[in-house]
From Swiss-Prot:
Its EC number is 2.7.1.39. SUPFAM superfamilies: GHMP Kinase, C-terminal domain (SSF55060), Ribosomal protein S5 domain 2-like (SSF54211). The lineage of its organism: Bacteria, Bacillati, Bacillota, Bacilli, Lactobacillales. This is Homoserine kinase. ATP binds at P78, L79, A80, R81, G82, L83, G84, S85, S86, S87, S88. It catalyses: L-homoserine + ATP = O-phospho-L-homoserine + ADP + H(+). The gene is thrB. One of its GO terms (cellular component) is cytoplasm.
Length: 286
């Protein structure tokens, strides 16, 4: 059995801790024979290979008495880069328990459990459902709206250095004034409504007008400004920080993708440029 979970790009500008999209990088969990102890085969650095692996810790939170197995973990989702690497493991752990214990969990049940573990739904929701998901987690209740993402190219610049979420959250203000919060919320509303209406020109302007987190976090990612300027000159809809960063995401018309990829590569920044597509499946069992 294989469990396949997509990468995710959260926030998308002003949709802070609420909006995310599933993208075409993947975590694959392959389950083999039963064993006396959990064995996790992988080639990831600083990741446990036993029951202390986040995958197994998550699965055991769902079903304590799971029979251990030998498992192979393969991922092309880079760690601590703002592409939902930990969220993909959490969702995979929930699905592992669901499959091994025959729990028949609904997608909404998986979402609630994943959100309780992760603390917010912006990454785990699209990892479960695929597509674009707008969600909330208030008073221990999670709500999610799944919709298609308008046709566009995602060009990701993934730096060669990590940025831990705890570090990127540390630069955020502890509070926001009422008038500013109203304005920031209005911008987020327009961004989401424009995406759902398929108006990427209007969505792009709202995405780049975020007031919740990007003005503070962009300072941690030196590549952001040159990428944004280059992408804008070539007709991109928007440039935003994926999740907490440091990955910089360019949202562009399909016919501008090649030019943007070439231009970003010619900047010779410390990282790699990737073409990504929206994943429409979410959790996949093979």
């Amino acid at each position: 059995m294989k469990i396949i979970i997509p990468a995710t790009s959260a926030n998308i500008g002003p949709g802070f801790d609420s909006v995310g999209v599933a993208l075409s990088k993947y975590l694959t969990i392959e389950v083999f024979e039963e064993t006396d102890e959990w064995v996790i085969e992988h080639n990831l650095e600083h990741v446990p290979s036993d029951k202390n692996n986040l995958l197994i810790k998550t699965a055991l939170k769902i079903e304590k008495g799971l029979q251990p197995h030998r498992i192979r973990m393969i991922s092309d989702i880079p760690l601590a880069r703002g592409l939902g690497s930990s969220s993909s493991v959490i969702v995979a752990g929930i699905e592992l328990a669901n499959q091994l214990a025959g729990l028949n969990m609904t997608a909404d049940e998986k979402l609630l459990k994943a959100t309780e573990i992760e603390g917010h739904p912006d990454n785990v929701a699209p990892a479960i459902f695929g597509n674009l998901v707008i969600s909330s987690y208030v008073n221990k209740r999670v709500q999610a709206v799944v919709t298609e993402f308008p046709e566009a190219s995602f060009v990701a610049f993934i730096p060669n250095y990590p940025l831990r979420t705890v570090e990127s959250r540390g630069v955020l203000p502890s509070q926001m004034g009422y008038k500013k919060a109203v304005a920031a919320s209005a911008i987020a509303n327009v961004a989401v409504a424009s995406l759902m209406a398929g108006d990427l020109e209007k969505a792009g302007k709202a995405i780049q007008s975020d007031m919740f987190h990007e003005p503070f976090r962009q300072l941690l990612v030196k590549e952001f400004c040159p990428i944004k300027q280059t992408a804008q000159e070539l007709g991109a809809y928007a440039t935003y920080l994926s999740g907490a960063g440091p990955t910089v995401m360019v949202l562009a018309p399909k016919d501008r993708e090649d030019a943007i990829v070439l231009a970003l590569e010619e900047l010779n920044l410390d990282g790699t440029v990737h073409r990504l597509q929206v994943d429409t499946k979410g959790i996949a069992i093979v």
